Amino acid sequence: MAFNFTLYIKSTSTLAVIALLQSACHAETNSVDATLRIDADTVVQTADPHRLTGTNLSLWSRLPIIENVNFQQAIRDWHPGSIRIPGGSWSNEYYWNGNGVRIGDNDHSIENFDQSKQQADGSWEVDYSEYKKGFRLHGEERHLSNYHGDLDVKTQHEWINSLGTEAMVTVNVGSGTPAVAAEWVKWANQTQRYGVRYWEIGNELNGDWELGHRLPDGSSMDGTIYTQRFVEFAKAMHAIDPDILLGGPACSDLALSFVEELLRDGGDAVDFVSIHAYPVGVNTRQSADKFAAILELRKAIHRVRGWISKYQPERTDEIEIGISEWNIKVNEDRDTAELISALWSAIWIGVMFEEGVDFANQWDLTTYTEGGGHSAFYIDEGNMSVLPKSQYWALWMWSNLMGHEMVKSSLSGMESVKSFVTRSDTGLQIMLINTSESDEANVAFQIKGASRVEGQLHTYSSAEYFWDVHAREPLWSRPPTVQQITVNHSTTITLPKFSINVLELPWASQHTTQHTPPAAAVQPSLQLSLPHRVPADRAIEAWVIASDPEAQLPYLQSIDTIQLSIDGPAILSQASIELDNAVGSFTITPKGAGKLTIHARSGKHSTSRSIELVAIEERAYTNWTFDNPISDWQAKSTFELGSESSIKPNQYVAAARLNGETPKRDADLLFHFEPLPREKLSFANANGVTGQLRAAHNLQCADPKARINIILQSDANHWMPIGSIKLSNIIGEWKPFAVKVTKPEELDAMAKLYGLR
């Protein structure tokens, strides 16, 4: 296979006690969209909400951020049951102790490490008589990385303990040894007295992105080999501390790779099964489909329980199930920052509770991108400030407002409403999530044996959180609003559209507390959320917002209809707009290049913003000529990679020689370029890939429909299939191709490109 290639161009809010607002209770004459029937006397599941709302702390987290007092207080208010370290894929790349390897200052320069300590098998010789900051490896050769993180494991352990929560440790299977893991157990639990109970063996070793997935003989890690390694690690670690709990395989997704083999062959060394979940697909666009992806969790947990019953039936009540990493999706786009992240997470945690998941750790505390990121916080590194994102408040609501016993309930009616009902020593807790983006929902309660009681309704909606996709920050992020309501055996309440609601009903002998009204903008200031400069061929999402931008408060009182107008080469989707929770959206469709000014007016309030619409000119830039040494290409292949000068007249081409090998799962990569060269162009302007492909004239393929896929990778979207070429069309002759990126969300991700496959 030969390839000729060019690129085608183109401050934390603390919890405030809030608000007696207008009643959410409605007259009995209001229509009912859904009915919730509750039997508070029948418990159907038990769980510790704190254990289901754990999180992850990564070594690359910035020290000034984790030392930020507002950040620390927000986590204390959250009460996560555990915090997993040292951080995702780095778990397989990081030696926790650098004593004897680090010989200089604690920076990342190669001269500060004794490279003679690397053994022939790629492992490193560490002196465990003392502790020094650890070090990170890179690549299959296990060379030292040029970045080892801002934190070290001692900092992680002590920071977690200072917050009053527990650490969960993932040990290095990818490049470490059982002895390295056992030394961590000894140091943490015997020397330092950290008291770490949960230890996970390896991270996502089913994935070819993980160091350790590729074995020394060139084959790939599988479930049988992983389980053998697990047992070796477990023996060494239990020899140090027999009371610790060990688990794995921390598989990358709900396909549950390696889980069956571990339960079948791991025996009583397995104390818990850990899995990871990012179930919403990269190309899932509709909100309803994103929420539907949560159902995959139920199927996965049922499969795990089936394997436990099959292979270790005497331990069905003993082996725990944990989800040591989860978030809405892998790619860190706006879904990880907008309000949907909160609603999705609230339902996800509820389903984990229903299915009997024992513990879970959201991914993560501090990993972010400009467009969003998995972090539960918005992080401004310039000011070293943090602000909770919407997902934080979903975690907070489950951890602080919900009970530990789920009771019997049934919900009928409007499909967009989801419910979870728990009880505790203090009372009954009812969580209702309205996933409709357009409609409120009237929900009637029928509570068996209930009498009249004063309750508190906590509501989280766009009135509490709004993410500005153009400014890429929250315009406001506030705790759930609280209002007092009276509930009896048949009460109806209205749920705002796209909202989380928790109704706390104390037992009859208890009393609620009155609250002060929430802070709100006194006078509205209109603003337009728009980009500054955009291509003239893309529709523009826009918002009118009524708020106090300095105080980050929405204006929630009524405001006259907003009148919109435009000067310049574009049209508006509408001439007027009504605000809902201080926000209204519209669309601008460009009709050419030039300056565009949008005006918004409501009574005496007005604002204007200008946009530059940029004309599009396309040209191709050649990035690889393949006439230089292969080592300079920054390329690799599953197959033999070479340079050929005899296939194309007067040109060099890249060649992947199959040599009779058959592509198969995890071994089908023709060319992988990473990192991409940035010298000639700004990736933010790139909008496709162009090149030429040819297969040998005698190449045979049993599948006439076989295709070669072209995939771009970005820090904002790690897997973007942008096109494919039918294999039969390139056998024996060169075929040019040009594949353009057209989806707005993928164009937005181009600025952070790092790989081409």
Language model feature labels by segment:
Residues 662-752:
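Extracellular ligand-binding interfaces
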Residues 31-268:
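N-terminal catalytic cores of secreted or lumenal carbohydrate-active enzymes
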Residues 223-345, 355:
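Noncatalytic carbohydrate-binding groove/subsite architecture in carbohydrate-active enzymes
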Residues 415-453, 457-462, 499-504:
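Carbohydrate-binding surface patches
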Residues 91, 323, 327-426:
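Aromatic/acidic polysaccharide-binding cleft in carbohydrate-active enzymes
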